[in-house]
A protein has these predicted regions:
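Long, contiguous internal "core" modules enriched in hydrophobic/ aromatic residues
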Residues: 25, 84-93, 98-107, 208-210, ...
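Cytosolic juxtamembrane amphipathic/interface segments immediately preceding
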Residues: 7-19, 153-157, 238-245, 313-316
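Low-complexity, proline/glycine-enriched hydrophobic segments characteristic of transmembrane helices
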Residues: 42-120
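Transmembrane-helix bundle segments that line or gate the permeation/cavity pathway
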Residues: 41-60, 129-238, 255
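Membrane-interface segments at the starts/ends of alpha-helical transmembrane spans
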Residues: 14-19, 110-125, 198-210, 243, ...
Length: 341
């Protein structure tokens, strides 16, 4: 089937980095590592300085102007003395709020201390891994939905999104590493039970055990489907016939349904739960739109780069118009979801 459209040279075409590009990539990796180390050093050296200086300035201000402290206390007592006794409901509301958010009014786990430099570094790693996961999942959905729709135009470029979702096993390793420092990132873990009424109502879902189990299931199925679709795709090109196509069609149809459920829950677990007090009923769709827009942008850049390097000469302007249209369409769709929130 595919062999009638592609020459044997095109079917076995493989991209290889030139020495110049390889040196650039290694150089950028080295610069990235250096910047990470510099950022960690600066974050470490800057921990607590802002809070301490603020406290010292406040103490000096009160020492130099003791009347300020007295007047402030008098105003506080006037504002909450008779009024608070006259309105018991208001007093009970304040008391309940203080109990829900800790004695300091900012939550038991994050009221007194800001994020440490270690937390900043781990959070940067966490967000970077999330970014590449969204691109890989957008590429995987792109392949699956076009297989279900029996679209023929994407055959010329499908090796690129297949390479993009090849990142998923590495992303899974990063996700497993993230399990080790969940208690430094997620507020619903940091705040002890009983100190935040709203978070307590969500602990049946937001708990470390459920989070880890769902994540393992999601990544396991995603990686399995990605490997199966990739293997069937190469067999279809080399062996021809409809057997591998029909197998990939069935797998893709089931995956599209699983993707809609799993990716929405993944977005809630890994992104939305970072702000457990915030509500959104369309966050799964919003994340999906962003994934597809990012994946299409990455696909466009890679295809144009490969064509300039002399690869994929069979990709014509019609193909370019199609995936550029996808990029524009999902960018508009993402913007609409963003405004809707």
């Amino acid at each position: 089937m595919a062999s009638s459209h592609f020459t044997p040279e095109q079917l076995t075409e493989r991209f290889e980095l030139s020495s110049r590009i390889r040196n650039i990539v290694y150089g950028l990796v080295g610069v990235g590592v250096i910047l990470v180390l510099i950022g960690a050093f600066l974050a470490q050296s800057g921990d607590g300085h802002h809070d301490d200086s603020h406290g010292e300035e406040h103490a000096e201000l009160i020492t130099e102007n003791p009347t300020i402290h007295t007047v402030a206390n008098d105003q506080h007592e006037d504002g909450h003395g008779e009024d608070s006794h006259a309105d018991e409901d208001h007093g009970h509301a304040d008391s309940a709020h203080s109990e829900a958010h800790g004695d300091d009014g900012h939550g038991g786990g994050h009221g007194h201390h800001g994020p440490t430099w270690v937390t900043r570094v781990l959070t940067g790693f966490y967000m970077s891994n999330l970014y590449f996961i969204t691109i890989a999942m957008g590429a995987l959905f792109f392949i699956a939905v076009h297989r279900v729709g029996n679209a023929g135009w994407q055959t010329a470029i499908r090796r690129v999104p297949e390479a993009m979702f090849g990142w998923l096993p590495f992303a899974a390793v990063g996700a497993l590493a993230s399990f080790l420092f969940m208690d430094q990132i997620f507020e619903w873990i940091i705040i002890p039970e009983g100190q935040d009424a709203l978070i307590d109502t969500k602990r049946a879902y937001l708990n470390p055990t459920g989070f880890i189990i769902r994540s393992i299931i999601f990544f396991g199925v995603w990686i399995l489907v990605a490997r199966m679709l990739r293997r069937l795709s190469t067999r279809e090109d080399t062996l021809g016939g409809l057997q591998n196509f029909e197998k990939s069609l069935g797998i893709s149809a089931g995956f599209v349904v699983f993707f809609a459920i799993s990716y929405s829950l993944f977005a809630i677990d890994w992104i939305k739960s970072l702000e457990p007090h915030w509500f959104s009923t369309i966050f799964g769709v919003y994340t999906f739109a962003g994934s597809m827009a990012s994946a299409m942008a990455t696909l466009t850049i890679l295809v144009y780069f490969l064509r300039r390097q002399g690869y994929m000469k069979y990709v014509n302007d019609s193909h370019a118009q199609d995936f550029n249209t996808y990029m524009l369409g999902f960018s508009i769709f993402w913007a609409y979801m963003w405004v809707s929130q």
